[in-house]
Every structure is written in C-alpha cells, then in structure tokens.
Amino acid sequence: MQSWYLLYCKRGQLQRAQEHLERQAVNCLAPMITLEKIVRGKRTAVSEPLFPNYLFVEFDPEVIHTTTINATRGVSHFVRFGASPAIVPSAVIHQLSVYKPKDIVDPSTPYPGDKVIITEGAFEGFQAIFTEPDGEARSMLLLNLINKEIKHSVKNTEFRKL
C-alpha cells in the first residue's frame, strides 16, 4: 500500500535525489517558499525549500524496497521512529501541498521602522531607522544628526539590521 515517508537528503543534493527518485516512479514533494532577501546588495525574491534537505516521498514498500530508495543518489537516510521509517499522514502532505505562504521576508532583511547600523561610508557606526527600499541596490535611512532627522540613501551592503 502506498504511503508517504520522509527522507533526509545529503547537503545540497535535494534536487538530485528528487530527479533520481522520480525516474524510479516515486512521487516526491519538496515544498518551496519564496523569500525576499538581500543578495549581493540587491533585493531579490529567492525560492528555497521550506524544509532544507528533507524530501517527502510516496511509494509502496512492497513494490520498491526501502533499501532501493536509501541507495538512490542524493539520499542520506529515512527519518525513522525506532527501526522502521516514519509514515507521514496524507492530511499533512495535503496541507503542505495546498499551503502557499505570501510576503515572507528573510529575518535579516529590514522592515520599515527597524533600527539599523551603518557599517561603511561617511556615517559608519551611526544608528538609523530603515524607512523604505530605494531601488534594488539602495535603501532610504532616517538619520538623527544634531537633533535633526535627515533621509539618506545608502547601499544595501553598507548597513545591517540591529
């Protein structure tokens, strides 16, 4: 009888494991999430696995043995409870396939109103308040200089969130 199981894949080989398992007629699910991150100084949307290195697989152990799955390229091992691989309920798989999170931002990416510290440039060491993105590679910060608030555009690589 077909059931869902959870595999742990070797680091960086989730895609490889999924491709090889699908060639063996194993149904695979690797839920993805889109994050807004600052990569090389630019705000970009990046798609990442919701559960890094974990892959949900559906197969019948009477047809395809677990050792065949375990020996597949990119697969490290089954997640187990005791001696046998853990069976994941179909309701959990259904929820994961239906769930589509929106507007998720990397925790290190500042939101408007967050305090930041400037790490480079003329204002190095100053604390500021992040107000808004200014294009892909820059952001607007609110600086308090001599009791006067000044808006200043700074490269995304020149500050970090506190």
Swiss-Prot record:
The protein in question is named Transcription antitermination protein RfaH
Record function comment? Enhances distal genes transcription elongation in a specialized subset of operons that encode extracytoplasmic components. RfaH is recruited into a multi-component RNA polymerase complex by the ops element, which is a short conserved DNA sequence located downstream of the main promoter of these operons. Once bound, RfaH suppresses pausing and inhibits Rho-dependent and intrinsic termination at a subset of sites. Termination signals are bypassed, which allows complete synthesis of long RNA chains.
- Organism the protein comes from: Escherichia coli O6:K15:H31 (strain 536 / UPEC)
The annotated phenotype of a deletion mutant is: Inactivation results in increased initial adhesion and biofilm formation.
NCBIfam families named in the record: PRK09014.1, RfaH
Which UniProt keywords are given for this protein, alphabetically ordered?
A: DNA-binding, Transcription, Transcription antitermination, Transcription regulation
* Cited Gene3D superfamilies: NusG, N-terminal domain (3.30.70.940)
**Pfam families, A to Z:** NusG (PF02357)
Q: How does it assemble?
A: Interacts with both the nontemplate DNA and the RNA polymerase (RNAP).
UniProt entry tagged with the keyword DNA-binding: yes
Q: Name one GO cellular component term.
A: cytosol
Gene Ontology annotations of biological process type: transcription elongation-coupled chromatin remodeling
Q: Which family does it belong to?
A: Belongs to the RfaH family.
State the SMART domains in the record: NGN
- Gene Ontology MF: a single term: DNA binding
